[in-house]
Amino acid sequence: MNTTQRDRVIVLFVEMVLIMLAGDLLAASETRPASEYFTIKVIDRQTGRGVPLVELRTTNSIRYFTDSNGIVAFLEPGLMNVDVFFFVESHGYQVPKDGFGYRGARLKTTPGKEAVVKIDRLNIAERLYRVTGQGIYRDSILTGRPVPLQNPALNGQVMGQDSVDTCIYHGRLFWLWGDTGRPSYPLGHFATAGAVSDLPGHGGLDPAVGVNLEYFVGKDGFSRPICPLKEPGMVWLDGLLTVRDGVGTERMVARYARMKSLGEAREKGLAVFNDTTQSFEPVFRSDPNLLPYPDFGHAFRVNAEGREYYYFALPFPLTVRMRVEAKWDNVIDPNRYEVLTTLQPDFVGRASPLATYRWVRFDALVGKNAAAKARVAAALKREKKDTHFYDAESGKKIVPHGGSVYFNAHRHKWISIFLQTGGESSYIGEVWYAEADTPIGPWAYACKVVTHNKYSFYNPKQHPYFDQDGGRMIYLEGTYSWTFSGSEERATPRYDYNQIMYRLNLDDPRLSLPSPIYQVRDGQSGRDYLLGNAVARAGRWDSVESVAFYAIEPNRTADGLVAAYAQKTTTGNGRAVRLATQPEASAKPLFLALPPVERQSENTCIMPLYEYHHANSGRYLYSTEPQLQEQGWKREEKPLCRVWKAPSGPLLIDAHAKPADRF
């Protein structure tokens, strides 16, 4: 062996040793013992549960975020075994200020030790965990804490996912998301991702703990498109539902849109899931403007007049204006979908302002002129444009972006979880709760349950099959993203562009919303004043004249309210109902209201409720109007109490709609 060969052997030997040492060092760094980390656990002061998505920031701006257990694994050279101050902040949560006005905690960062930071929840809803993305339990794994998921670090190679829809299919929960990110390149796939999970009580986790998702993946292990089309464009699905076909097989159907851009579609139609290919395939394809509504939102089952329907919580703005009978031939034919409208059959112009809303089949509006579909669809979109709620606390108008509607057994009402467009602290990051007596309304007052600071949380959806304690506890999730409300520079590591789950206790007194008090004909030229449940029990929806005002139900609790009672009196012309705040013996309150104070509330929706008496008939009438146009009515000088006014607009009641016995 010459000198050159000997030198080459020595160099190769040294390189091998260095590679082996580097590998050992890398392996050691990847398997650091948990004892090297200082563990910080942030818990909800009210519940004691760990809080995800809490930022801890050092005085030199190193940012950490708690994982889904509320854990941060801290290991920072130069900052171990010393006192470190962490600024602590989180959307909808906060810690108290110190004497200098700083919100945070000073902790001794001892390896192997744990510190607990208690944080106060401002949100009514409780943040539970992240559903999708990488590193859901990263810090818990690093610190040796137990985790509930089968794939707590990476599942289906999914880095981020947009907008959820779900339904129960073949006894399991079927999940859909839109655009999906991957680790290996900035572009993932854009033709809808899917997964399944077991239901709680049937092999699935308690929804308070998490969801074990089984993704549909390709050969490379990455989530694969489940609605692949040959033509170019992103493919998004919504309106997910199941129905049995002509031979009794359960089928899953969705509306699809093939998009050119975020706001422009190339085509829209209906797609059916193929159990063999495990993909959605178009069954109806059309121009993007030929469906009754451009987006279907979330479908929910309703029984109406002995028939089973799917109603749709249509977005932009959120309103329930479409349904289809739950039959195979109907759900795959847009012409058989029904719309709630004032438009007349063979529509040729704008709707009459005096016309009443009723359910009409789409093909009945279009008639024999198929070319009229786009014109009718545009008119339907205009008709629902001016839809809004009111903040029960401030009286401010809320424009609903999108959300879901389901019947809640605990509240005996239809409830909506929806997103606000144009929120104050985030453009599309404020989530609200509302209730109604029927699925189409009357929807009026709402309460904010989730807030974000210059960050989006869009397309929220309730998961009714996760309800607990008879519906007292409900679960909802949405997409957390900087897009639309924040800046990419402030994107939250791991959490951004992913789904986050919340839980809401419907017995929280802050959810005591004003309910409609209906003015109902009594059949004797008089009027009754009833809550929706009383109207339904008596079967008197057809006798409802109007919503007289809104007040708090007597079974709800709130500070500073007075009870109002309905007292029956006899007049020369028969029976009359009179409201009073002083009860008769053993009387039960009809509703709760605010006391009749003199000062004007800053909430312009809160109004004095006046009693009017008709001398000739002896009847009584109650209104928030300071004067009535009708003759013969004399107003009491002082108001009975203060209530929430009935907003102007059409009275939307679906008296025949009942909750279905399944989702």
Where are these regions (language model features)?
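Beta-strand-rich domain onsets/edges
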Residues: 24-38, 45
